[in-house]
Amino acid sequence: MGMPFIKHVRAFTVRGGGADYHDQGGGHWIDDHIATPMSKYPEYRQSRQSFGINVLGTLVVEIEASDGTVGFSVTTGGDLGCFIVEKHLARFLEGARVTDIEKMWDQMYSATLYYGRKGIVINTISGVDLALWDLLAKIRKEPVHALLGGPVRDELIFYATGARPDLARQMGFIGGKMPLHHAPAEREEGLAKNLDMIGDMRSKVGKDFWLMLDCWMSLDVEYATRLATAARNEHGLKWIEEALSPDDYWGYAELRRNVPRGMLVTTGEHEATRWGFRLLLEMGCCDIIQPDVGWCGGITELIKISNLADAHGKLVVPHGSSVYSYHFVITRQNSPFAEFLMMAPKADEVVPMFNPQLLDEPVPVNGRIKASALDAPGFGVRLNPDIALHRPYPRQAA
């Protein structure tokens, strides 16, 4: 019996946390005076939700095969992503063999070049691609990582992103990455507060625990150089992440030349496709690239990005993304550790990143996840049936 074909594609929106992890209630650390490109405007400085960071919502993509198997994924994209899936991308999927993932990716990308390339369109293509890998692996009754060549290590080790690296150390993580709170618009006083925060956290975690700083595209080269130099020399900061606009490749190259020896410059969370990462790598912009598999083009594109980085001798440490990253990282020698996003409001406990949208999502125990915890078919997670799905652009089955 041959491989089934794709029978139908469906796209839904969901509100409230999950894949759009910024869509949280009040009092969550992830929305507490964090430096952003909008920090130059005082009225948008205190809360990231104030400028609309959570407007997209979650995109859920379901792909049903002719044998009844359903693959799915979640990413950011919301109503806009649903429109792109149902009105444009579905034509390249329905009727295709489930194994033709490379061809489907190329058709989706090529057909959207005139309005896509990055942003919401690549987010959406990423979501479709992840659902295709989930579907194929379920049909083959294998985990996605088996389709990618299998594990190269027995467990994943994690650093934690959140407001409390001191608690992350107690939970067994290898390091902690904090959000930057004050942007250049807050002048010297803000810079001093940033350095005080890093110094205070260093005193709590000790000298051997990794401390990193997530700047979320909020700085300029001069400020980032001053911050990185002082934080490295005074407090042993391991890396400075996404300090500049993702479009400023020249600035990243300059920043990397400027920082102290041993200080790492990392970026790539908001970069997309092999062509974007080619610029980062060839221009010497960073030491570690951090593609988000739900935003950079999916697994199909992340394979190419990772191979490109490997040829340049650079590490790939994907941004967040839970199981969608785990199944990839466990198969790659140049991805020696992974990120875990602390989604508890106070960053004081380990909870699933995509809660409440996904069920059976594994979480680190003592900062680790065994490879065997990823052995269920597909990505090993289920969509929570209690979540209210909305399909804004329904179609008849092909």
Curated annotation (Swiss-Prot):
Mg(2+) binds at residues 214, 241, 269. The active site is at residue 319. The keyword Nucleus does not apply. It holds the Pfam family MR_MLE_N. Belongs to the mandelate racemase/muconate lactonizing enzyme family. RhamD subfamily. Catalyzes the dehydration of L-rhamnonate to 2-keto-3-deoxy-L-rhamnonate (KDR). Reaction proceeds via a syn dehydration. This is L-rhamnonate dehydratase. It comes from Verminephrobacter eiseniae (strain EF01-2).
